[in-house]
């Protein structure tokens, strides 16, 4: 594998928008019993449904441990899904995996961020995370992609969204958290994002969704749907703890221009629930010191914004909530050229994330 000493920007590479043509989507098989209830079996069923939904539109590669390989291979029984044996600590490939970058000639490379399980020993969600730290380089090696390495700079893919035209959206709650890069200032973080993703403007929203255990990842709160247009998780209920967060984000977006000088068009996506885990669901999770506790009194950070754009499709979570159909209708209106597929999201939410968190798109190479 080739490790480059330059930066993507210096080499003419940038992170494309999620709606750019893709060659495949990466996923990782869930099995961690101190995060996924009942040994991960319900979450595995949800993963199968999501992988098969994506495979209708493009290829999927699922990384799975040696212990679960036969099970995963048997259940992911469609030709468009490849299963590869790969060790990991958990299934959050959006955050532990690489970020792919592309140049004008269509060449694809990868950025291998440093990963510390969302905070390391200062609020992180599990330890150890050494296998997850290797995941990005393993994916890039399988794909024969040259890689850039950001030693000393922690970043998760779910903490950023880009429009492919120079603008990145993130949250202060995550990127300025003391458990990520306390040695860096906001300006230094912006400079690194500029070097490795080739963005010219960083839009800082104050917070992500309430109780998001990743410290407010933007991919659960606000995402691009096309250049200059975003979809923001929203509530009109002033008693909802998300109310102030949504309105603060809207205030920033309404008073900010993007890298191209455009004012943002903001669409509002209703938040489901409030949603909570049941006592039975929490009891199915192994209680291990150092791992995130599951408690039925803690509100879950459910969000329809946590969807994935694929070639011709939108794969979005459903929660058996009255708001599910409204979310589907809004997404179909916003993406008229795509087919919206709602996939089971509750088991993923119980584990701390959702469809976007558990997937990583790989852009398609092309010739200029």
Swiss-Prot record:
Keywords: Hydrolase, Polyamine biosynthesis. The active site is at residue 357. Pathway: Amine and polyamine biosynthesis; putrescine biosynthesis via agmatine pathway; N-carbamoylputrescine from agmatine: step 1/1. InterPro entries: Agmatine_deiminase (IPR017754), Peptidyl-Arg-deiminase_porph (IPR007466). This is Agmatine deiminase. Mediates the hydrolysis of agmatine into N-carbamoylputrescine in the arginine decarboxylase (ADC) pathway of putrescine biosynthesis, a basic polyamine. PANTHER family: AGMATINE DEIMINASE-RELATED (PTHR31377:SF0). It comes from Pseudomonas savastanoi pv. phaseolicola (strain 1448A / Race 6). One of its GO terms (molecular function) is agmatine deiminase activity.
């Amino acid at each position: 594998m080739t490790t480059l000493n330059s930066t993507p920007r210096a080499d003419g590479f940038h992170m494309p928008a999620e709606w750019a043509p893709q060659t495949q989507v990466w996923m990782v098989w869930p099995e961690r019993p101190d995060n996924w209830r009942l040994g991960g079996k319900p979450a595995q069923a949800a993963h199968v449904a999501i992988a098969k939904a994506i495979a209708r539109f493009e290829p999927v590669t699922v990384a799975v441990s040696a212990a679960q390989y036969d099970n995963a291979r048997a259940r992911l029984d469609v030709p468009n899904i490849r299963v590869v044996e790969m060790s990991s600590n958990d299934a959050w490939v959006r955050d532990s995996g690489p970020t792919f970058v592309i140049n004008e000639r269509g060449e694809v490379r990868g950025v291998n961020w440093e990963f510390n399980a969302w905070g390391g020993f200062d609020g992180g969600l599990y330890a150890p995370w050494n296998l997850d730290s290797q995941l990005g380089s393993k994916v890039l090696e399988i794909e024969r992609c040259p890689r850039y390495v950001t030693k000393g700079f922690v970043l998760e893919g779910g903490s950023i969204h880009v429009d492919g035209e120079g603008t990145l959206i993130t949250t202060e709650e995550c990127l300025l958290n003391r458990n990520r890069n306390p040695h860096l200032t906001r300006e230094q973080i912006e400079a690194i994002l500029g070097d490795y993703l080739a963005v010219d403007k960083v839009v800082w929203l104050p917070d992500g969704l309430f109780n998001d255990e990743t410290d407010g990842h933007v991919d659960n709160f606000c995402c691009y749907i096309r250049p200059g247009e975003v979809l923001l998780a929203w509530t009109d209920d002033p008693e909802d703890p998300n109310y102030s967060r949504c309105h603060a984000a809207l205030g920033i977006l309404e008073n900010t221009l993007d890298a191209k000088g455009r004012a943002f068009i903001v669409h509002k996506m209703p938040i489901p629930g409030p949603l909570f885990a049941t006592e039975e669901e929490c009891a199915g999770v192994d209680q291990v010191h150092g791992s995130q506790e599951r408690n039925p009194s803690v509100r879950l950070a459910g969000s329809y914004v946590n969807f994935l754009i694929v070639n011709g499709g939108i794969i979005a979570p459903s929660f058996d909530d009255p708001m599910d159909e409204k979310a589907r209708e809004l997404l179909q209106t916003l993406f008229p050229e795509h087919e919206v597929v709602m996939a089971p999201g509750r088991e993923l939410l119980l584990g701390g994330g959702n469809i976007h968190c558990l997937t990583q798109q790989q852009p398609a190479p092309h010739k200029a």
